[in-house]
Design a protein with these regions (language model features):
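Transmembrane alpha-helices and adjacent helix-loop boundaries
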Residues: 2-361
Length: 361
């Protein structure tokens, strides 16, 4: 007697194997964006560039949440510290562009390291509240420190340079410069997540006690992850200050912190690439909702609630959510198409017949 064995494929499902095609299309649209809009001087700075630096900063938040299990509300503050570093170096000290950029990135990364030293031993709501409190402490400092931040007036003007081989004052060139940075930040996050360091972070996220028992120093890994996320946020802060041409306490305010959180949730709190979709939604609402209502911030809140209710995984997770629904329906249909569940299988019937015959003998 031969038995037919069904082979179960252990490979990734079709949608997962070809999901990269969707992101290639998104990047293609981003590249074509400056050439298809009718008013580039409006669309590129207000929608394109702003969406990109918002996405870069939000990506640092998503990295911590996805691979470490920590939700940080200090990422906007870290980006703001980086922006202040660039502004202070260029406006107050009169340093060159590259030195100022390096100063900003170092300042933001060091700030993230200090946040990590304070908050790495906590988790969940305690980590969130500590990072929020630290952000508000710096906001108060930036609003009052006239010698360093120029208080409410901020630091200005911060001019984009003409580097010879690339002129960042040209809006199209600056857009492609920021787009390249966004792609590099995304690839860097994916690379770090795939290294032994990233795999250890995921193990710490799932079971810190077990990883500690295996000899991993959990706090050190968390400090490293928070510092790396601060480095990514600092790059976003550099782009922010070059785009705005000034830096003031508004960039580290509670409103800016909530903007980054909204971008991450709408795009997908577990998707590194989805943050750019969330940033696009937020910038569209900021620029166009004001034409229809004077309560455009309320409209942003409504969109935020709708996403939480109907797409908890964000815009980037809608495809997976639809796939799960389809798979569940297929299983339900296959269950009802098997046959009469009350009918006993032949193997069971033959076993009962054998027992009956044995008793008769």
């Amino acid at each position: 007697m031969t038995q037919q064995v069904d082979r179960v494929s252990t490979s990734k499902p079709l949608w997962a194997r070809y999901s990269w095609i969707g992101w290639v299309i998104v990047v293609g649209i981003a590249v074509a964006f400056p050439f298809v809009v009718d008013r580039p001087r409006f669309w590129l700075p207000n929608i394109g560039v702003r969406s990109l630096w918002l996405g870069i900063i939000a990506m640092s938040l998503v990295f911590l949440n996805r691979y470490v299990g920590l939700l940080s509300l200090a990422q906007a503050t870290i980006a703001g510290i980086s922006a202040y570093g660039v502004g202070y170096a260029m406006v107050t000290m009169g340093l060159g562009f590259f030195v100022a950029v390096a100063t900003g990135i170092v300042a933001g990364t060091v700030a993230g390291f200090l946040v990590a030293l304070i908050a790495a031993r906590t988790k969940a709501i305690y980590f969130l509240m500590i990072t929020l409190a630290l952000g508000q402490v710096f906001y108060s400092y930036a609003s009052q420190a006239i010698e360093v931040t120029n208080a409410r007036r901020g630091l200005a003007p911060i001019k984009k340079p003409d580097l010879g081989f690339v002129n960042l004052n040209d809006i199209t060139t600056f857009y492609f410069f920021v787009l390249a940075l966004a792609v590099l930040c995304y690839l860097l996050c994916r690379y770090v997540a795939a290294t032994s360091f990233g795999l250890a972070l995921q193990g710490i996220r799932d079971s810190p006690e077990r990883m500690a028992a295996l000899g991993y120093r959990v706090n050190r890994y968390r400090i490293g992850a928070i510092t790396f996320a601060a480095f990514i946020a600092s790059i976003g802060g550099v782009v922010l200050v070059l785009d705005r041409a000034q830096v003031d306490p508004d960039v580290v305010s509670l409103g800016s912190t909530l903007d980054i959180l909204v971008v991450a949730v709408i795009g997908g709190i577990g998707s590194l690439g989805g943050v750019f979709l969330g940033a696009l939604v937020l910038t569209f609402l900021d620029n166009f909702a004001q034409d229809f209502t004077d309560r455009y911030q309320s409209l942003t809140g409504v969109v935020f609630i709708i996403v939480l209710l109907f797409a908890p995984a964000g815009i980037a997770g809608i495809g997976k959510q639809v796939k799960r629904v389809i798979d569940r329906r297929r299983k339900e249909l296959s269950f009802f198409s098997v046959g009469d569940p009350q009918q006993e299988p032949p193997a069971a019937q033959s076993a009962e017949e054998a027992i009956t015959k044995g008793k008769q003998q």
